[in-house]
Amino acid sequence: MRLKKRFKKFFISRKEYEKIEEILDIGLAKAMEETKDDELLTYDEIKELLGDK
């Protein structure tokens, strides 16, 4: 079975691209800063939190 791709093509200027890239970088940096002290959970801990034992 073939899936049809439904992508629209559009073009942006180099300046617009760089602006979008800068915004994404700022968002990533903020997300990394906010989660730097978070503990990572194991798969089993996540299942337990969800009530799936």
Swiss-Prot record:
* InterPro entries xrefs: RelB-like
> What keywords are annotated for this sequence in UniProt?
Toxin-antitoxin system
Query: Pfam families, per this entry?
Result: RelB-like
User: Could you name the domain of life of the organism this protein comes from?
Assistant: Archaea
Instruction: Please indicate if the UniProt record lists Nucleus as a keyword.
Output: no
Assembly and oligomerization: Forms heterodimers with RelE and possibly a heterotetramer RelE3-RelB3(2)-RelE3 from 2 heterodimers. The heterotetramer is probably not very stable in solution.
Entry function? Antitoxin component of a type II toxin-antitoxin (TA) system. Probably neutralizes the toxic activity of cognate toxin RelE.
Name of the molecule in the record = Antitoxin RelB3
**Source organism of the structure:** Methanocaldococcus jannaschii (strain ATCC 43067 / DSM 2661 / JAL-1 / JCM 10045 / NBRC 100440)
